[in-house]
């Protein structure tokens, strides 16, 4: 029947295309497919597919290099930095067979064949330690320089503080050692400490005068002759004992404060809570108009007559007291 022949021809055509036999009853019979053709050059195909692939695709890097017909390294290479032969092969960089990575044990640095040389050691410990050491030295030197500069900066201020405590003196007091017998225990000094030593010795002489010692015979003699020193000194110490030595000076007046011409208790001028006392440290008195203060007209001359070494009997006097001698004309 032509219809059956046409149907069989159609089944054969499906067999050639699908690789299976379909019977007229609807049964499908499996048929094995023909094997694939083998690659004539399997090595070339393996290199093309495995180059640049990670190692999980199968085989080690050495095996892959052998399959890629890469010759093995003949001995250790020389380091391009230090020319040391103490090197070793590490691995292929980025799983690329064209970038073998080596390590130099001499300079402890890696390098890649065909790559740039980086001067970074393994771990970077040495360079980091050197930087810390250098920074520490720099910090220590900077701190020492700051300390020295602070010391130098403090020295002028201390010098100024020291000079501010010095007292002004008359130039005639610099030669007091030549007069002798005034009992000030002065020594010839040089430099800036001269005025300071004179001031300290004069202050001690003031305190010694109040206690009745450390004074010369002419000065104490005149005071003892003209005054009843026992009662006067007791009254003076009773009133001045609670005051500091600097409270004896009147800061409000530029000249000496003379209140009475009686005994020494009146000359000190104890009035109220403040005590005015003649400063034994001779100040350079400012210019005073003679018309305004006629009683002190003779004070424009050198104070206490210290310029003439010949008059040593009553040269050092207590202004305001009854002294006999050349100094009485000042009163």
UniProtKB/Swiss-Prot annotation:
Composition-biased stretches (Low complexity): 135-160
Chain positions of all zinc fingers (Dof-type): 77-131
GO CC entries: nucleus
Pfam families: Zn_ribbon_Dof
Induction: By auxin and salicylic acid (SA). Induced transiently in response to the generalist herbivore S.littoralis. Triggered by methyl jasmonate (MeJA) and wounding.
Binding site for Zn(2+): 79, 82, 104, 107
Chain intervals with Polar residues compositional bias: 305-316
One GO biological process term: response to wounding
GO MF annotation, one: DNA-binding transcription factor activity
Name of the protein in question: Dof zinc finger protein DOF1.1
Residue ranges the record marks as coiled coil: none
Keyword field: DNA-binding, Metal-binding, Nucleus, Transcription, Transcription regulation, Zinc, Zinc-finger
UniProt note on tissues of expression: Expressed in the vasculature (mainly in the phloem and associated cell files) of cotyledons, leaves, roots, flower stalks and petals. The PEAR proteins (e.g. DOF2.4, DOF5.1, DOF3.2, DOF1.1, DOF5.6 and DOF5.3) form a short-range concentration gradient that peaks at protophloem sieve elements (PSE).
Known function: Transcription factor that binds specifically to a 5'-AA[AG]G-3' consensus core sequence. Enhances the DNA binding of OBF transcription factors to OCS elements. Involved in the regulation of root development. The PEAR proteins (e.g. DOF2.4, DOF5.1, DOF3.2, DOF1.1, DOF5.6 and DOF5.3) activate gene expression that promotes radial growth of protophloem sieve elements. Element of a regulatory network controlling indole glucosinolates (IGS) biosynthesis, probably by inducing the expression of accurate genes (e.g. CYP83B1). Promotes apical dominance.
Effect of a null allele: Reduced expression of CYP83B1. Longer hypocotyls and increased lateral root formation.
PROSITE patterns attached to this UniProt entry: ZF_DOF_1, ZF_DOF_2
Assembly and binders: Interacts with OBF4.
Ranges for region Disordered: 121-166, 291-331
Subcellular location: Nucleus
Source superkingdom: Eukaryota
């Amino acid at each position: 029947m032509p219809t059956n022949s046409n149907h069989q021809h159609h089944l054969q055509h499906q067999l050639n295309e699908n690789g299976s036999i379909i019977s007229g009853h609807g049964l499908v019979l499996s048929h094995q497919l023909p094997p694939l053709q083998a690659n004539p050059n399997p090595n070339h195909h393996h290199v093309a597919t495995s180059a640049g692939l990670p190692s999980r695709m199968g085989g080690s890097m050495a095996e892959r290099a052998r399959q890629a017909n890469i010759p093995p390294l003949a001995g250790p290479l020389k380091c391009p930095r230090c020319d040391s032969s103490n090197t070793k092969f590490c691995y292929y960089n980025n799983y690329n067979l064209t970038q073998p990575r080596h390590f130099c044990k001499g300079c402890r640095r890696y390098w890649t064949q065909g790559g740039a040389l980086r001067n970074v050691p393994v771990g970077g410990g040495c360079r980091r330690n050197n930087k810390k050491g250098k920074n520490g030295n720099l910090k220590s030197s900077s701190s020492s320089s700051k300390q020295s500069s602070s010391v130098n900066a403090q020295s002028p201020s201390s010098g100024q503080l020291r000079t501010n405590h010095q007292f002004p003196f008359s130039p005639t007091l610099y030669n007091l050692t030549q007069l002798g017998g005034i009992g000030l225990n002065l020594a010839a000094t040089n430099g800036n400490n001269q005025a300071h030593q004179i001031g300290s010795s004069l202050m001690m002489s003031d305190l010694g005068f109040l206690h009745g010692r450390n004074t010369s015979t002419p000065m104490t003699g005149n005071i003892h002759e003209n005054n009843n020193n026992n009662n006067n000194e007791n009254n003076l110490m009773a009133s001045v004992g609670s005051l500091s030595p600097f409270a004896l000076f009147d800061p409000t007046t530029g000249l000496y404060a003379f209140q009475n011409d009686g005994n020494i208790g009146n000359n000190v001028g104890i009035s109220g809570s403040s005590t005015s006392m003649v400063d034994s440290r001779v100040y350079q008195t400012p210019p005073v108009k003679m018309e305004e203060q006629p009683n002190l007209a003779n004070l424009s001359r050198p104070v206490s007559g210290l310029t003439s070494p010949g008059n040593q009997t009553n040269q050092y006097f207590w202004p305001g007291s009854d002294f006999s001698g050349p100094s009485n004309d000042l009163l």
